[in-house]
Amino acid sequence: GIYPFLAGQIIVGCCQRPSRDIFKKCLLTRKIVLSLPENFNWDDDKEADFCRSYCDKINEELCKNEFIKKQGIRIDKILLYKTDGNKEITQDRNGYKNSGTAKIQSEMTDEEQLMVRELCSKNMLDNEHYLIKDGSLEYNPSFTNLSQTEWNLLRSNYKHVVGVSKMFNPDLLKDFNGHKLSKTIANLKPFERTKVYRYQAVNKDSEFAIWYVRLRKSEFRETHFSDVVKCEMVLEEPGALIDTDLINIISANIIKEAFPVCYGKDSRWANHLYPIFLTETYCKSNYLGQDILLNLF
């Protein structure tokens, strides 16, 4: 068979705002990874050993190029994707490509969680310092390149993390009367939030507190959900509650950050939070140009 070799850039970044007037970079992880078919390990060596030694060989060759050596560009990791045992992989024309891409995406979500762990280990998150994570906090344990034990331990780092999603399914939850929540969300007044709802992860491994906030007054919004964000926090144990005052403080701070400075630059501007927009911009500025990446191979 013909198997694709895939390369991906992974950038995970975090910025901090020590005061209203100061916004600065905090952490950045940048990796270039290769996703290769598992049968590329032709000697059936232990996967980790094979990937490490082959990665070293590639970097040895790359360093012969003066520009690459000077810029410190290197392949950080080799991932091996599945090539059999699954009809979706073997029968779909793009099956191998999808399998390889999934490996790279899993590496990215792993790095997101490892960055949260690093913030916790540096005592940067507490009752006075919360992390706003762009997107959902729901991670699927089936899509990880970490061991199950290591992945499970990462979930304990999310006490002071709030996931904020610009795009969401308004019909994900039902209200306390069993009706779809989409109508309640659509009818939110400016700066109003919904009640907080308990949501169990699809894989049943964790529970979340979820609520929705309308960020601004907008007479010309495209849809009823254009300036609404979905907020979520991990519940530390089944049945746990989060104090209403804390939810209100978090919601108020999120509303304060909703400056539409990226209007016209991003179709999601109505749902944007300014610090997230700046952090996204910071991360994008650290990507290698496509020409440089392609010329590595």
How should each PLM-predicted stretch be described?
Residues G1-Y3, C15:
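Two-metal-ion RNase H-like nuclease active-site motif
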